[in-house]
């Protein structure tokens, strides 16, 4: 089991709120940045905007889970 960096599409979970005359962007109630002009954003590290979508870079589990390596399916144990 290992962790890989992966870009996750969070576009549908990003919301905007006007604060001090600027549009602040939030993901899961955490401020992730601001819109600076049309289709231009200042985003917190770990977030990006590409092809009109917002992405979050996260650690994702990859590979086999070691606890399931030596299973004996014929005898029904794992």
Curated annotation (Swiss-Prot):
InterPro entries: Uncharacterised_YusG (IPR020140). It comes from the Bacteria. Pfam families: DUF2553. This is Uncharacterized protein YusG.
